[in-house]
Amino acid sequence: MACCAPRCCSVRTGPATTICSSDKFCRCGVCLPSTCPHNISLLQPTCCDNSPVPCVYPDTYVPTCFLLNSSHPTPGLSGINLTTFIQPGCENVCEPRC
């Protein structure tokens, strides 16, 4: 029996400003946080169909000002969410379930 359900994705809960653009791949559609003029780290949540890895690990740092400033285009802006969440059944994806 598999330890985790396939395609199950999880990130730590908490307030965040989610900004994903089409030129950056955000696994499971999750980007965490911040606000301009700071940089954000695109964090990839754990997917249960992979071998056990840390819940969240940094991927790429990108400036976000151009996405938040209306005087600049927003290439591929896909959405802005205010909170993160954990899918049902994935609360402890970093713990072995076998």
Curated annotation (Swiss-Prot):
Segments of this protein annotated with the region 4 X 5 AA repeats of C-C-X(3): 3-59
Tissue: Wool.
Keywords, alphabetical: Acetylation, Keratin, Repeat
Gene Ontology annotations for the cellular component aspect, listed alphabetically: cytosol; keratin filament
Residues carrying N-acetylalanine: A2
GO molecular function: structural molecule activity
Spans of repeat Sequence: 3-7, 8-12, 47-51, 55-59
InterPro entries in the cross-refs: Keratin_matx
Superkingdom of the source species: Eukaryota
UniProt record similarity statement: Belongs to the KRTAP type 3 family.
Described purpose of this protein according to its UniProt entry: In the wool cortex, wool keratin intermediate filaments are embedded in an interfilamentous matrix, consisting of hair keratin-associated proteins (KRTAP), which are essential for the formation of a rigid and resistant wool shaft through their extensive disulfide bond cross-linking with abundant cysteine residues of wool keratins. The matrix proteins include the high-sulfur and high-glycine-tyrosine keratins.
Assembly behavior: Interacts with wool keratins.
UniProt-recorded name of the protein: Keratin-associated protein 3-1
Lineage: Eukaryota, Metazoa, Chordata, Craniata, Vertebrata
Gene of this entry: KRTAP3-1
